[in-house]
Amino acid sequence: MAAAEFLVLLKRECETCRMVGPVLAGLKARARLTLWSQDDPAFPEQTGGALDDRSLEQSWKHKVEIVPTLIRLEGGREVARTEGWNRADWARLTGIENIGKDLPPSRPGCGSITMDPGMPERLALKFGDLKLASRPIEVGEMDDPHEVAYDRGWSDGLPVIPPTDLRIARMLAGTTRKPDEVIGLIPPNLAECTIEKVAVNAVMAGCRPEYFPVVLAAIEAALKPEFSMHGLLATLWFSGPVVIVNGPVTKRIGMNWAGNALGQGNRANATIGRALQLVIRNVGGGRPQEIDRSILGNPGKYTFCFAEDEADPDWVPLNVARGHARGTSTVTLFHGDGVHGVCDQRSRDPESLSRSLALTLWSVCHPKLAQWSHAILVLSPDHYDIYKQAGWGRGEIEAGLWQALKRPGRDLVRGASGVAEGIDPSHANELVDKFHPGGLLVVRAGASGGLFSAVIGGWTAQRRNSEVQVVSQEIGT
């Protein structure tokens, strides 16, 4: 068997490292010992100093998180390690009984410099396999990087975070996927997009690394052919992608499904949706007044992302209703317009409330057009309580709304009520549904305190229900 040798990584700044100096001197006299110091090669004095690891290459290579770290090597390969000072552990690794007998039985170590904020990413860029492929842009010392981003057309109109190598590396640490993996071709230019390019735009959007898997899932969902992202970009209508997030990830990354869930103020909500839009703009070339021909647009084309309220165990979340297992984290993408408020402070039974909500839902696109678009109904807690107290869950609510949304065709045909717009006269004797089957998505969000809910109208291309569909995607790692 090969003779054991030992490796110790330490720093002068750590009191525990200073304490074990005499122990290291004794170990060096009895065994082959290599010392690496993170901050001072003259330390420890008892051993005549150490090798210089101020670059932190050795500490990074050996994945040191705590100093001192004692590593036992056999045949040049690590077989065991211990962190900090623990007499029993050091005796076990070195085979020296009563090692450090004059020291306390144990003492915790200190944080390695490799774990300082930003340092893991710096070291990965310097010494690791992470090699960024993105072309670096030199910014002059007197130039404002935010203005450079505006000048180069990278911004959606709001300032972006400069995507430095360090920030990109930190974002990439939020996923297990390789930077050079191609996630797909981004419309409208069908430009090849790698995980790294998504990371660049997620940085610019202001995302934290823990949001990154959600961003990737949103991109993958948007690229599904049935979502028709290219068509959504080119439409004259108002719509843009709306991202609804379900599952444990919403709590883990601190998303908002409560007060102001559809508004500003939550970093995860705001930046996940913005990252999707920036990828479409900066990678795919989807810019307003170019391929994006929307007549008016809507503020949600900056970002439109929120989480569903899943606090009530009796409620079936949207992703479960769409076929995913409960407890799965997913994104659902909808082609949505702005928010239309619904006020009903008098209904106290589910039938009345359903009829009331249906009146507003009929206004989506036009009150006399049917099956032209889909819609999201965002039920507030107070409106949901009316349903819940009556024993209604998702199934009953959807069925009640579906029934309330039927109208006589004669009231909707062109020319009826003196309005030229309307459905084809051939449907005059039919009972007409407002939406295609599955065209109304019901979700829960918002705060208590007002009997208000919200309707988010959909893209008019959804009248071709077999070609343009709402899509979902599980969130990976």
For every predicted segment, state its role:
Residues 124-477:
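Non-transmembrane, aqueous-exposed alpha-helical and coiled segments at domain scale
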Residues 100-133, 140:
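Iron-sulfur (Fe-S) cluster-binding modules
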Residues 30-55:
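Thiol-based oxidoreductase modules, predominantly thioredoxin-like and allied folds used
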Residues 61-65:
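A short glycine-leucine-enriched loop at secondary-structure breakpoints
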Residues 4, 27-29, 37-39, 70, ...:
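Catalytic cores of nucleotide-enabled group-transfer and carboxylate-activating enzymes in metabolic
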Residues 9-13, 36-39, 380-382, 445:
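Structural motif
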Residues 2-24:
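Short active-site neighborhood of thiol/selenol oxidoreductases, capturing the structured segment around
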Residues 66, 71-109:
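Non-catalytic, surface beta->alpha helical segment in thiol-disulfide oxidoreductase systems
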